């Protein structure tokens, strides 16, 4: 009975905070958590199996673990705080970095951040501010550079999945194997044609806006054009 009550509460929060164009809001939470479990298993494969298939493995071993429901509850509360821009949980500069990432050209950042949270949360389910800030800066720089240099929906999988394994092993995220030449990136950005139809255009607008210290936090559902 207690399990059913907690499960229903999880469903309610997911429906409240996640937009799920395909699948259900709960699928979104389970997907974010899956990347943490994948990383712990050391899976680097760029092909991701279907959500149901992943959790069905070994007779639903992950779902049967005692800590799994608690982990899902912690993860959904974290994302609730992110999406409500909770300034009791996050500093202003963290909220600004998260606001920029909200306009990232793809959703890979949510998986990286979910893995980071699961690995580094303290007993109060909080993250050390300075380390989290540095992590957000790194993934923002890398994701933006990748969008210019290797555009494509699935291109980020190759560098992101190994980095998730680095995170769960307590190592610093540095994308060492996948770095670009700074001059080459600068050249591409300077000659790029920014049109409204390109996802990176909104990403750059958000990045530019929040680099201005006087820019107030905008609600995350604001459309940038």
Predicted regions and their residues:
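A cross-family structural signal marking well-folded subdomains
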Residues: 2-223
